[in-house]
Amino acid sequence: MKQLNILLVALLGLTAVSAQASVANAEKLIMIYTTQAKAANPEYTGPTVADGKFFFNRKIKLGNGKEMACASCHTANPADNGKHVATRKVIQPLSPAVNAKRFADFEKVEAKFTQHCTDIIGSDCTPAEKASYITYVLTEKTPSAKK
């Protein structure tokens, strides 16, 4: 029994370290996107939670007349599981505090931004939008069921 408790403590510790690493990766992505945004616009002052939250919840009218937002699939709380509006497939939380795999791979993050921004907005998101989006997602650490 004592060995099981030690194993559980070790596993919980690894999960915490993994979540911290994912948050650190997200922060690195924010720095990369902020640098890109400043290169494109020297007057850019940096990402904000307010801009990220607005971008995340902003409804955009699609060609079929329906409105979509990031929150349409990812829910209003990025720490919650989402559900794809078309396939109904469960989407793991965006918040790296809850989902240690989120923001772990820069190429995957960039590919998802390109795919989803093009599908919804009609073009890739700007580096400033990406930086603010991730900044906002980092603030949501608690799933709704636990609030």
Predicted regions located by residue number:
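The canonical Cys-X-X-Cys-His
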Residues: E67-N77, Y133
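Post-cleavage N-terminal segment of exported redox proteins
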Residues: K2-F54, A97-K147
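Short cysteine/histidine-rich zinc-coordinating motifs and their immediately flanking basic loops
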Residues: G82-K89
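Local sequence-structure signature of Cys/Sec-based thiol-disulfide redox active-site neighborhoods
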Residues: K53-M68
